[in-house]
Design a protein with these regions (language model features):
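Substrate-recognition/cap regions that form aromatic- and gly/pro-loop-enriched pockets
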Residues: 66-155
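Zn-dependent metallopeptidase/amidohydrolase metal-coordination segment
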Residues: 68-70, 74-81, 88, 140-203
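His/Asp/Glu-rich mid-to-C-terminal helical/loop segments that flank catalytic regions of hydrolases
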Residues: 1, 40-50, 58, 98-101, ...
Length: 208
């Protein structure tokens, strides 16, 4: 327990800036039975978690501070005879995403495991020149007398799927303000919903 508590203190100090409220608790439950690994299997699992990359892989060359390619270990499950790790791979570059996917797969096989791909969606690559983005920005500025906030983000968005269906498809993603998205406290701002409606109808009139 002392070793675990010392390790917890080291981790809390290491992540004090990015995760200031990090809490690690170790409880001694007494004797009991649970799944455990022998020394060789334990070392193999440590190698798996250390050798397969995790986190930011590459930053964008076009936009300062934007992550371009990453992967994250989201779920790790230890069963009676198996260990399964689920990674989410994201990239705004299709070639980088495919390379990283292949790299993780090859490393998994090298370590004696197998892998499968699920929920694969194409990358939505950044365009320096976008006519629809410029049109939306101009319409927003004119309708609401303020500059449109145009941002890029490192996330999985359906536009990547749609853009891959037609060559040279120009896409943007926009919508009303949503607070606490993807949580039970999710809320939609009604006033921004009205602005979104006015914006999209104005742009559609220009495209008609």
């Amino acid at each position: 327990a002392e070793l675990l508590n010392n390790t917890a203190d080291v981790l809390k100090e290491e992540y004090s800036v990015t995760d200031p409220h990090l809490t690690i608790k170790v409880n001694c439950e007494g004797e009991g039975s649970t799944l455990a690994c022998d020394d060789a299997t334990t070392q193999m699992l440590i190698n798996v978690l250390n050798f397969i990359p995790d986190g930011v892989v590459k930053m964008s060359n076009d936009i300062k501070g934007l992550v371009q390619t990453s992967l994250n270990l989201g779920v790790a499950e230890l069963a009676e005879k198996t260990f399964a790790a689920t990674y989410l791979i994201r990239s705004s570059s299709q070639s980088e995403k495919e390379y990283l996917t292949d790299k993780v797969g090859k490393m998994t096989e090298y370590l004696g495991g197998t892998y499968e791909l699920k929920g694969v969606y194409p990358a939505w690559e950044f365009k320096k020149n976008s006519a629809i983005r410029d049109m939306l920005s101009e319409s927003y500025n004119r309708l609401f007398n303020k500059e449109a906030l145009v941002e890029t983000m490192h996330a999985g968005v359906e536009c990547g799927i749609m853009a891959a269906k037609i060559d040279d498809r120009d896409c943007v993603s926009f919508g009303p303000d949503i607070i606490d998205i993807h949580t039970v406290k999710e809320k939609l701002d009604i006033a921004s919903t009205q602005r979104t409606w006015e914006l999209i109808t104005d742009v559609l009139k220009q495209l008609a």
